[in-house]
């Protein structure tokens, strides 16, 4: 990758700079560009057929040193020393282990101190760095864009292509700027920003775009908060999300196991500091949010765009002027068993899930512990707190957070994707309602017939205590 000297005639966006630095072969006007990939992350669900393709063709993994695998989607978060009960999940995990051993790919299996959700593991090890291209057979690869990387999910055939060549044929994306300026009110978090954005532009609003998040409110976020925002770019329909690196980024990366050291750090910093959108660069689309007007947000329906402030009520489909929107709302309310006009704070839950690649990091767990400390989970509510990685779990234990969770009556688990999706034992029963810090509230996402409300960690913790959708301020 070269250093942008600022002499380019046409001002470029951050996404365009990273793209240009990774073009191996230009496709011109009619063909895709061939893009070099700096980091390829792999898990057990989308990789088996890709490795099979390599095996059939007699090809090795081109750059095993730039490839990292971890077990996350299918793994249990209790009794991890026992065999996985579900035969499909067990087969996928065992297949990943055999493939990584055969092709020389690093793997962090269950029980390893570095195992966890792939989008938590990469950043915490310092593997994800500004200006990189990052891919994974997982839609929420956009998480890594918080570092100023161009990161996107890919399909299994593309996973095979990257394993074989360390490149990917891609057509340039459109660009969108999401400007969030002003000071966030107390109790409003990164999760509330992204839920409010998706409610504003819809789940298709970012289709075909790479979103760059900008403005003073974004700059004020920690790296954990930035990862939350970029993680859910996909729920807005975008291909990727990015935030320009700054001092917050550099301090997070400094001294991480795989971060550059010494002279290499200095050289990397010279490149990283060029990774900003040029003055005068033009975005295809621009969106504005006033940070001061935001409040804790929660979804009421079955897609992430069906959300309202916690202080609001379940919307009335009859008041919606768009036919498709009205029909979708009616269908969602029927599935969610909600009535228009019901205050969101009156909605009782059966379960609370804290975790996922959206909100399973140490900062998220600290927020939850602050709310739970000295309090109890409401009777009849089951609360799961699942760290995004074993490293996060170890840090939480060192800070005494695990004791806070268990004293409150929550279940303190091992690392994994857990109740974010119904691919492991952590699932809702039909008809159960859950406040979840994850990223998707589709029908059956957390288990057949389960009903999901997407919330921030702060709202999740307060909800667990009150038993109804709540913010920490409601506990005072």
From Swiss-Prot:
<keyword id="KW-0479">Metal-binding</keyword>
<comment type="subunit">
    <text>Heterodimer of LeuC and LeuD.</text>
</comment>
<keyword id="KW-0100">Branched-chain amino acid biosynthesis</keyword>
<comment type="similarity">
    <text>Belongs to the aconitase/IPM isomerase family. LeuC type 1 subfamily.</text>
</comment>
<keyword id="KW-0004">4Fe-4S</keyword>
<feature type="binding site">
    <location>
        <position position="417"/>
    </location>
    <ligand>
        <name>[4Fe-4S] cluster</name>
    </ligand>
</feature>
<dbReference type="GO" id="GO:0046872">
    <property type="term" value="F:metal ion binding"/>
</dbReference>
<dbReference type="InterPro" id="IPR033941">
    <property type="entry name" value="IPMI_cat"/>
</dbReference>
<keyword id="KW-0411">Iron-sulfur</keyword>
<comment type="function">
    <text>Catalyzes the isomerization between 2-isopropylmalate and 3-isopropylmalate, via the formation of 2-isopropylmaleate.</text>
</comment>
<dbReference type="InterPro" id="IPR004430">
    <property type="entry name" value="3-IsopropMal_deHydase_lsu"/>
</dbReference>
<comment type="pathway">
    <text>Amino-acid biosynthesis; L-leucine biosynthesis; L-leucine from 3-methyl-2-oxobutanoate: step 2/4.</text>
</comment>
<dbReference type="Pfam" id="PF00330">
    <property type="entry name" value="Aconitase"/>
</dbReference>
<dbReference type="InterPro" id="IPR001030">
    <property type="entry name" value="Acoase/IPM_deHydtase_lsu_aba"/>
</dbReference>
<dbReference type="InterPro" id="IPR036008">
    <property type="entry name" value="Aconitase_4Fe-4S_dom"/>
</dbReference>
<feature type="binding site">
    <location>
        <position position="420"/>
    </location>
    <ligand>
        <name>[4Fe-4S] cluster</name>
    </ligand>
</feature>
<dbReference type="GO" id="GO:0009098">
    <property type="term" value="P:L-leucine biosynthetic process"/>
</dbReference>
<dbReference type="InterPro" id="IPR015931">
    <property type="entry name" value="Acnase/IPM_dHydase_lsu_aba_1/3"/>
</dbReference>
<dbReference type="InterPro" id="IPR050067">
    <property type="entry name" value="IPM_dehydratase_rel_enz"/>
</dbReference>
<protein>
    <recommendedName>
        <fullName>3-isopropylmalate dehydratase large subunit</fullName>
        <ecNumber>4.2.1.33</ecNumber>
    </recommendedName>
</protein>
<feature type="binding site">
    <location>
        <position position="357"/>
    </location>
    <ligand>
        <name>[4Fe-4S] cluster</name>
    </ligand>
</feature>
<dbReference type="InterPro" id="IPR018136">
    <property type="entry name" value="Aconitase_4Fe-4S_BS"/>
</dbReference>
<keyword id="KW-0028">Amino-acid biosynthesis</keyword>
<keyword id="KW-0456">Lyase</keyword>
<keyword id="KW-0408">Iron</keyword>
<dbReference type="GO" id="GO:0051539">
    <property type="term" value="F:4 iron, 4 sulfur cluster binding"/>
</dbReference>
<dbReference type="GO" id="GO:0003861">
    <property type="term" value="F:3-isopropylmalate dehydratase activity"/>
</dbReference>
<keyword id="KW-0432">Leucine biosynthesis</keyword>
